[in-house]
Regions:
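RNA pseudouridine synthases
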Residues: 1-138, 142-167, 229
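Accessory RNA 3′-end/elbow-binding domains used by RNA modification enzymes
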Residues: 3-5, 23, 63, 145-245
């Protein structure tokens, strides 16, 4: 049921994908409040139907409480590993799985459009911008709990991965869009650290550079070309990835 942006790397650019996938994600989703499922989405069996009466003030408070830095328990039917085995595999084999809460950041959680009231449940269209590793299904589930009911996800579309939006993508079966260069890709998702030819050569030889930059991950450009991705800690570099060649 999920659609939207999927960033694919070709050749040596595949080594950069982890920096892209670690970027915040933006989604458009539909949440059905008043009904819960085994998987927290529409693909699972309905497990409860307590219903929910439209309450805009209560909804606003619940959404606000789930925005910012929160602790989230991933959906049990997920790819999270428990003692080396995916949680969804344990659930499907009949095990009861309890996953630990993990910190995530919800930068944006907004209800868009008008609610659709159908019987004893309400469908809400929402926009979510969240840190990598966030389960929007779990966010829907937790919204239901905060509203004193249950909820699950009925539609999900990823509209952006970091700065890469759905408008830059091609649908499967269509002519693909122009390939984005590795330099352009990493420069859009990471801050740039420009160094001289001599410093670039030192990095290639495995030397540590002392730089005037804050802690974080940077793409190193030498004469406008990406050479490496480095982590900077206390002004010192550590190579994460080198460009080929």
């Amino acid at each position: 049921m999920a659609t939207g942006v999927l960033v694919v790397g070709l050749g040596s650019a595949t080594r950069l994908l982890r920096f892209v996938q670690g970027q915040p994600k933006t989604y458009e989703a539909t949440i059905r409040v008043g009904q819960g499922t085994a998987t927290d989405d529409a693909e699972g069996e309905v497990t409860e139907s307590p219903g929910w009466e439209w309450d805009p003030a209560g909804l606003s408070a619940a959404v606000s409480a789930l925005t910012g830095d929160i602790l989230q328990v991933p959906s049990a039917v997920s790819a999270v590993k428990v003692n080396g085995v995916r949680s969804y595999a344990r659930v499907r084999s009949g095990e009861q799985v309890e996953l630990a809460a993990r910190p995530v950041h919800i930068a944006r959680f907004e209800v868009s459009g008008q609610p659709r009231i159908e019987g004893n449940h309400v469908d809400l269209d929402v926009v979510v911008k969240c840190s990598s590793g966030t389960y929007v299904r779990a966010l829907a589930r937790d919204l239901g709990v905060r509203l004193g009911s249950a909820a699950h996800l009925t539609a999900l579309r990823r509209t952006a991965v970091g700065p890469i939006g759905v408008g830059e993508c091609a649908h499967l079966g269509q002519e693909p869009p122009p390939v984005v260069s590795a330099e352009d890709l990493v420069s859009r998702v990471l801050p740039v650290l420009a160094v001289s030819d001599e410093e670039g050569a030192a990095l290639r030889n495995g030397q540590c550079l002392h730089v005037n930059a804050g802690d974080g991950t940077y793409v190193v450009l030498v004469a406008g070309q990406w050479q490496s991705v480095v982590a900077v800690t206390d002004g010192q570099t550590r190579i994460e990835v080198n460009a080929p060649g």
